[in-house]
Amino acid sequence: STGANFNDVLGELSPLIKDLESFNTVADKKGYPSNIKAGHFIINKGMNNNEIVNAIRNGNVPVIVKFNNQERIENLAGSLANQLDADSISFLKAMRNEQFLNKYGLTKETALCNFIPNSYEVYWNISPENFNDKMHEESNKFWNDDRIKKTKNINLTKTQVISLAAIVQKETAK
């Protein structure tokens, strides 16, 4: 996790390490104890100590974050916190941040519209602020000219369509 020290890392990895002394030697030679990075790493059974150290030094791999329509922004923050490094309070603060809302023309009531339900590839330790920005980019990709035209054809706004979709999903899930 973010803020871990070398002993924390050893505690997490100890079930995978056959020779702890050898692992410490390799880690020291590569300068790992003084350069620990948070992230999501893939450690496979049978990897040797050098491969493990290389994986945790250089191998932060993306994770897939999934969420569906949420009725409340607090629910979304909780879902994200279960999948990523930051806690739900940090996500919630970022989603309600006035600068974020103003930057993208949102209000506290419409902030949830920035988050289009889907699966997204992000780094496990992405900051809530960077996650918000990524979701805004994804929202812009989703709301292309064709979709915006369709909302106008049925006399609805993007916000109304998103709200309606959330209601439909909630009702069909019953």
Residue positions per predicted region:
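Conserved catalytic or metal-liganding residues and their short signature motifs at active sites
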Residues: 1-174
